[in-house]
Amino acid sequence: MSTAKPTSPKRNWWNFGKKGQQEGKAVEKDESFYRAGQWQLVWWKFRRHKLAQIAMLVLGIFYFIVIFDEFIAPYDPQKRFKDYSTMAPVSVHMIDAQGNVHLPFIYGFERTRDPVTLRPVYKEDTSKIYPIGLFVPGDEYKLWSLFPGNIHLFGVRPEPGKFVPLFLLGSDTLGHDLLSRIFFGARISLTVGLIGILLAFVLGLILGGISGFFGGLVDEIIMRIIDVLISLPTIPLWMSLAAALPQDWPQLKVYFYVTIILSILGWTTLARTIRSKLLSLREEDYVMAARLDGESDGQIIARYLLPGFASYIIVSLTLSIPGMILGETALSFLGVGLRAPTISWGVMLQDAQNLQTVAQTPWLLWPVVFVVLAVLMFNFLGDGMRDAADPYVT
């Protein structure tokens, strides 16, 4: 009885070497790693925080308006239109009274008076249509106080002897366009937070760094000063210091000193953060190696310690900006900060102190909407940066 001899599978020996090389390359490719730096890891995590990205976009639009507000605002913020005071926001239309479709336009207005309150009333005249155009000539200005021009981003093209108000957010009691004033007010209300935080950053970095790195008696003195400052009520302290500013000072000087007042208490939280980080890092081996290498104390702090938690410092600064914005708004609203004719969101809200005025002209509260929006966007951005900088958050 014969048995079949088992046959072994045929092997293409001439392809074995090539296949092995390909598998080896695949393994090498799979085992290769990309080395990402700290900031790149932070950016990857930040990109997954959609709310923070939206906040960054909105704040970017705000600061773009701040830079180019002379061009973007439809009117000069100091110009008064006496015939259109306390005018409600105008309505933008695309379909006229006959049902025809147009590009965005507004109707003309007829000014009358309420027979009971004697307040001016503006009624749309549907027989007159005024298209809204882009790059429209209007009030003259100097962009950044350097480049003269009269072209505005949008507006109603002027007619000889005829003015048609494009008050998208209404006008105030003096006939100023609220939208233009909000754009210009953002220049102060949004920059006071950045400048105040910059001053607070310098103070917090220096005093917190000295306290955390050297410790001992210096640390005790600085910490007790911080404890005293934190125990002080913020708003009353700001009010008392701002009220001490002379009434005849130029507004630019008042703006500078209000910024300093806002930063007086803003540096304490950052200083405590830097101190705690330095206390935990100053005894590390790489710090000792830097000392043995002859590095000075300042070089050790700047080159080896601060970069290790720079992301936390940025997050802390970002979350502190809303407090500065609210502080300026509160001081100006109460009349002890910036004053008219300076334009800021807080100064604009002085018209809304009277409850009866607010009831009759609620559009005077539009600056509140922008203050709340700016504060929320900074908080959302700070939350996203904090989550991105935290290594324990995935």
Per-range role (PLM):
Residues S171-T394:
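Alpha-helical transmembrane segments of integral membrane proteins
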Residues S2-F201, L205, I301, G337, ...:
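Gly/Trp-centered helix-boundary motif
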